[in-house]
From Swiss-Prot:
It comes from Rhizobium etli (strain CIAT 652). S-adenosyl-L-methionine binds at residues 47-49, 64, 91, 109, 116. Specifically methylates the N4 position of cytidine in position 1402 (C1402) of 16S rRNA. The keyword Nucleotide-binding does not apply. This is Ribosomal RNA small subunit methyltransferase H.
Length: 341
């Protein structure tokens, strides 16, 4: 979610208004919340979607892996008389917090919350100087650990695959040279180096550090793996007719969601070079258009919405399929866990 420049005010749900929920009308149209329905918001953040779902009369189970978001959301919990349950959890574990086959909807907003972007000490933004952390929770390796310890070849893989950065080799070798002199500690250390080795051209629309910061954040938090596991989990907790709604912000995430819904449509995916594959029972059917993007008006008023894409599916009565990560064709980035140690 994107921070509200005004900040400081509160909404009807009792929580702070610090964000603009992206594609809110489209999310609600696809999710169809109503009294008597139970919806899981897997990415609570600043509570934008949850607040709107509650306003429609539904009950909500909301998850967030960030303890700061959970603490900030307690006022919203108190304001809704038992209709909101807020849980500190990664959304990949959503099946642990919902009845199997008992949900009417699941919504996931795959992005960094306003609270994380606003706090320099979290290290998510190159626009604010702070420690190179980028962890959405307090566990695991930090972005600084990755930069200071990973092999150059592994940095190139991270920047290229997760950030789609064309200058990955140049940046990785510059990082190797710089860390031999002094370890990376702050966001300014990294952003400054990237600006130095890949000067921004007049035609460029984004800061040269954008893709590297994105890649590090995704790697540190295993965001693609989390998303894939959440999609599989949602398939098990949605009742027939339940809706899965996912909002993504870059092409890697969108490809995962698109691949999942395409696969779960049950169509055979054989090749003319291989034996014919049998069609499977569909576990999801499409809801509305295959992909929805922001209107011109929303993109104008909320720049973050320009890259947002929404995909939604409706659960059928077919049995959930086994989770198979090979569906997405991820490279083995998990092998970087030791960071060259």
């Amino acid at each position: 979610m994107v921070a509200n420049p005004g900040g400081g005010s509160t909404d009807a749900g009792g929580g702070p208004v610090r964000h603009i929920p992206v594609l809110l009308e489209e999310v609600l149209a696809a999710l169809a919340p109503a009294p008597g329905k139970l919806i899981l918001d897997g990415t609570f953040g600043a509570g934008g979607y949850t607040s709107a779902i509650l306003a429609a009369g539904a009950e909500v189970i909301a998850l967030d892996r960030d303890p700061t978001a959970i603490a900030a959301g307690q006022a919203m919990v108190a304001a809704h008389g038992g209709r909101l349950k807020l849980v500190h959890s990664q959304f990949s574990h959503l099946a642990d917090h919902a009845p199997q086959g008992g949900l009417d909807g699941v919504v996931l907003d795959i992005g960094v919350s306003s609270m994380q972007l606003d706090e320099a000490e979290r290290g998510f933004s190159f626009q604010k100087n702070g420690p190179l952390d980028m962890r959405m929770s307090a566990t695991g390796v930090s972005a600084a650990d990755v930069l200071n310890r990973a092999k150059v070849a592994d940095l190139i893989r991270i920047f290229h695959f997760l950030g789609e950065e064309s200058q990955a080799p140049r940046i990785a070798h510059a990082i190797e040279k710089r860390r031999a002199e002094k370890p990376f500690e702050t966001t300014r250390d990294l952003a400054g180096l990237i600006e130095l080795v890949t000067p921004r051209k007049m035609k460029d629309k984004i800061h040269p550090a954008t893709r590297v910061f994105q890649a590090l954040r995704i790697f540190v938090n295993d965001e693609l793996g989390e998303l894939a596991q959440a999609l599989f989990a949602a398939e098990t907790v949605l009742k027939p007719g339940g809706r899965l709604v996912v909002v993504t912000f870059h092409s890697l995430e969108d490809r995962i969601v698109k691949k999942f819904f395409s696969d779960r449509a049950g169509k055979a995916s054989g090749s003319r070079h291989l034996p014919a594959a049998h069609e499977r029972a569909a576990t999801f059917t499409a809801v509305g258009k295959s992909m929805v993007s922001a209107s011109e008006a929303e993109a104008e008023s909320n720049p973050r919405a320009r890259s947002a894409k929404l995909r939604a599916g409706q659960r059928t009565a077919a049995a959930a399929e086994a989770a198979d990560m090979s569906l997405f064709g991820f490279p083995n980035l998990a092998s970087l866990g030791k960071l060259g140690g």
